[in-house]
Regions:
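A short beta-sheet element
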Residues: 52-53, 70-73, 78-135, 144-147, ...
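A structural supersecondary motif
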Residues: 138-140
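Flexible, active-site-proximal loop/turn residues at the rims of small-molecule/cofactor binding pockets
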Residues: 57, 94, 165
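A generic structural signal for short beta-strands and their flanking turns/coil linkers
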Residues: 47, 65, 109-111
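Sequence-specific dsDNA recognition surfaces
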Residues: 26-41, 54-84, 103
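Amphipathic heptad-repeat alpha-helical coiled-coil/stalk segments that mediate oligomerization
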Residues: 214-215
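Non-catalytic DNA-recognition/assembly elements of restriction-modification systems
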Residues: 1-36, 162, 166-211
Length: 215
């Protein structure tokens, strides 16, 4: 995915170099904040996995080690049920990390924000814009806290971004295949990791015998 991200960065840099008009992010995107899950309801395994700030990595959502639940809380809004292709932003700790959801049955925890573009087709554009070093630097500069940094969703939405609607839509259309390739690659990696975790213990225990396989 590094090569894909680099290709996207080149395109974004080209866009940023020619667009002089700026708008606040709030004019093109909203954030959905996560639900405050109760730790007493957590299970070692379950139908749903809860995505916290530690699961938001640069460019992906890693659900490894996520707490689980079997039943959805009654007070939780449906927009906290994550869909493949959703983009999340970390608001605490290593603030400003942005990743794409590539699995089903994931739930949005508090201090993680989900992107809700005013125009859905702008999502690839917004993902790569938020991944751009200049925007991440801005987010880090407004984060507050001593022991742990916290990023305000409201202040983040007040940040300015170079934006011209027609050009942004055109760029988003070009970036969309790269965005989809990243999702596909991450899904393949998740599948391979799952197979490894399932097969390796069986190989180590001798449950699976590969001695007769000729290479």
């Amino acid at each position: 995915n590094d090569n894909l991200e680099q290709q996207a960065t080149v395109l974004v840099n080209r866009y940023l170099s020619v667009i002089t008009e700026t708008v606040a992010f709030s004019e093109i995107i909203d954030f959905v904040n996560g639900f405050a899950f109760q730790s007493r309801t957590y299970l070692p395994a379950g139908q749903y996995r809860i995505i916290t700030i530690k699961n938001v990595q640069d460019g992906k959502i890693d659900s490894t080690g996520a707490s689980c639940i079997d039943c959805l809380p009654q007070r939780m809004k449906t927009n906290c049920i994550l869909q493949i292709g959703d983009v999340l932003l970390s608001l605490t700790g290593n603030v400003g990390r942005v990743g794409i959801v590539c699995e089903n049955n994931l739930l949005l925890n508090q201090r993680v924000a989900k992107f809700v573009p005013h125009r859905k087709e702008l999502l690839p554009f917004l993902y790569f814009i938020f991944r751009h070093p200049s925007i991440k630097t801005q987010m880090e500069s407004i984060a507050k806290g001593t022991a742990q940094l916290n990023l305000s969703p409201i202040e983040t939405l007040n940040l300015s971004v170079p934006f011209e609607k027609t050009k942004a839509l055109e760029l988003s259309k070009v970036l969309s295949p790269i965005y989809q390739f990243i999702i596909s690659n991450n899904q393949q990696n998740i599948l391979l990791s799952s197979l490894r975790d399932e097969l390796l213990p069986k190989l180590m225990s001798g449950e699976i015998d590969i001695s007769d396989i000729k290479i």
